[in-house]
Amino acid sequence: MIIADNIKQFHSIRNSLIKQQKIGFVPTMGALHNGHISLIKKAKSENDVVIVSIFVNPTQFNNPNDYQTYPNQLQQDIQILASLDVDVLFNPSEKDIYPDGNLLRIEPKLEIANILEGKSRPGHFSGTLTVVLKLLQITKPNNLYLGEKDYQQVMLIKQLVKDFFINTKIIVCPTQRQPSGLPLSSRNKNLTSTDIEIANKIYEILRQDDFSNLEELTNKINSTGAKLQYIQKLNNRIFLAFYIGKVRLIDNFLKETGPSC
């Protein structure tokens, strides 16, 4: 596996690739788990070259503490990527991605950008879309692999690719879950054993609910010791965000299936 720590190194690697080679790209913020691994395996099965990026993007965090406590396990991540036979790891610094600071940003005006995560985390999608645009301009992949867990974000990235005429296909892969139903997330690493017990109770409640009374469901979730930030039906999906202690988790799933594994 080749590791590029800056854009100049990456451009040299990218320019050496044969034009006919199909390139798959998996953007991450590190702290890799089986959800990331499923994306990478999918990319490996469909492309000649797989590029994975690790960049904890500061502009998408509206809470400085969330940014500072985001899990960092670079050496372990490198071992995981090498074991998966990833071709290139792109691991840029903040100075690489924002050489002159965050002077130009994508500001989404779509309705979907102003609800759920957009409402709860002002500026989050602006930072996310800005960095995704930068990463796509740098990597120039044929295929981009994203997880369904960030469904709202995926919808906005699809619009970004369409509106900026980016010649990249988006492949959305199913959410990977623990047996309890809890979606895999890098932030799960910050959960204590007590927190995990609370999470398991929440997903037991969710699996048994028919989502006909969200107010009652809110009370049930809050009774576990968690703090529900929102739960909302949108089309045929249920979206929710909640805190367990200081850890904020999000999820979405089809109403008909619930959070099934």
UniProtKB/Swiss-Prot annotation:
Catalytic activity: (R)-pantoate + beta-alanine + ATP = (R)-pantothenate + AMP + diphosphate + H(+)
Subcellular localization, as worded in the UniProt entry: Cytoplasm
Primary localization: cytoplasm
Biological pathway: Cofactor biosynthesis; (R)-pantothenate biosynthesis; (R)-pantothenate from (R)-pantoate and beta-alanine: step 1/1
Keywords of the record: ATP-binding, Cytoplasm, Ligase, Nucleotide-binding, Pantothenate biosynthesis
Spans traversing the lipid bilayer: none
EC number(s) stated in the UniProt entry for this protein: 6.3.2.1
Subunit comment: Homodimer.
Protein name according to UniProt: Pantothenate synthetase
